[in-house]
């Protein structure tokens, strides 16, 4: 497996590590998303202390408004995080 393929598989594995905890095994509840954000993107969101911001992130990702974030919706967050990481590498 190539390095990129390993990283892609890692993203899928992280999603599933949190999605299986509550409710449907292939979606993230608000609580699961919060846990994922605070543990897996801790440095990216370190300045976000307000619970309302996490709620806004959840609502923004929940495109079909079913109170769950599926993998397709989660990928939107991954894309935003990747853009931020890319931007940050050019600022250093």
From Swiss-Prot:
PROSITE patterns: EF_HAND_2, S100_CABP. Zn(2+) binds at residues 16, 26, 86, 90. One of its GO terms (biological process) is monocyte chemotaxis. SMART domains: S_100. Ca(2+) 1 binds at residues 19, 22, 24, 27, 32. Keywords: Antibiotic, Antimicrobial, Calcium, Cell membrane, Copper, Cytoplasm, Cytoskeleton, Fungicide, Immunity, Inflammatory response, Innate immunity, Membrane, Metal-binding, Repeat, Secreted, Zinc. It comes from the Eukaryota. Predominantly expressed by neutrophils, monocytes and activated macrophages. Expressed by eosinophils and macrophages in asthmatic airways in regions where mast cells accumulate. Found in high concentrations in the serum of patients suffering from various inflammatory disorders, such as rheumatoid arthritis, psoriatic arthritis, Crohn's disease, ulcerative colitis, and Kawasaki disease. Disulfide bonds: none annotated. One of its GO terms (cellular component) is cytoskeleton. It is found in: Secreted; Cytoplasm; Cytoplasm, Cytoskeleton; Cell membrane. InterPro entries: EF-hand-dom_pair (IPR011992), EF_hand_dom (IPR002048), S100/CaBP7/8-like_CS (IPR001751), S100_Ca-bd_sub (IPR013787). Ca(2+) 2 binds at residues 62, 64, 66, 68, 73. It is a peripheral membrane protein. GO terms for molecular function: calcium ion binding; calcium-dependent protein binding; copper ion binding; identical protein binding; RAGE receptor binding; zinc ion binding. Residues 13-48, 49-84 form the EF-hand domain. Homodimer. Homooligomer (tetramer or hexamer) in the presence of calcium, zinc and copper ions. Interacts with AGER and both calcium and zinc are essential for the interaction. Interacts with CACYBP in a calcium-dependent manner. S100A12 is a calcium-, zinc- and copper-binding protein which plays a prominent role in the regulation of inflammatory processes and immune response. Its pro-inflammatory activity involves recruitment of leukocytes, promotion of cytokine and chemokine production, and regulation of leukocyte adhesion and migration. Acts as an alarmin or a danger associated molecular pattern (DAMP) molecule and stimulates innate immune cells via binding to receptor for advanced glycation endproducts (AGER). The hinge domain contributes significantly to its chemotactic properties. This is Protein S100-A12.
